């Protein structure tokens, strides 16, 4: 098991996109996308299953999470503080948490994918 944290010059969205592409190319499946938001007196967490979602039509999970996060911001005044990706594979998993601040902090937790996590962290442009 490995826990690693790095700061990057990338935006939260760029970091999430890179993480999604990198870990999926390394054989992990995106299981869940997460948005963690804070209000003045509490918090909200939005979780959306990874991949495609079917409702009135077929939607990408990233689009659904983005829309729900924007609704929580505009309707309720909650502000996103972090975003997350949860990946699974037959041997283990990887969790990626990305802060919504400058510089962006990326926290990586791994079970059985330590080498890939280190390689991904090393590829990020450092803040």
Write out the residue ranges for each language-model feature.
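Residue-level detector of functional hotspots within protein domains
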Residues: 1, 9, 14, 71, ...
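Terminal, regulation- and interaction-focused segments at domain boundaries
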Residues: 1-38, 43-46, 51-62
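Hydrophobic, Leu/Ile/Phe/Ala-enriched alpha-helical segments that form helix-helix packing faces
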Residues: 19, 23-27, 68, 72, ...
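Solvent-exposed beta-strand/loop surfaces of large extracellular or lumenal domains
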Residues: 35-36, 41-50, 64-70, 75-78, ...
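Beta-strand/loop substructures that line and gate deep hydrophobic ligand-binding cavities in soluble
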Residues: 55-57, 66, 74-127
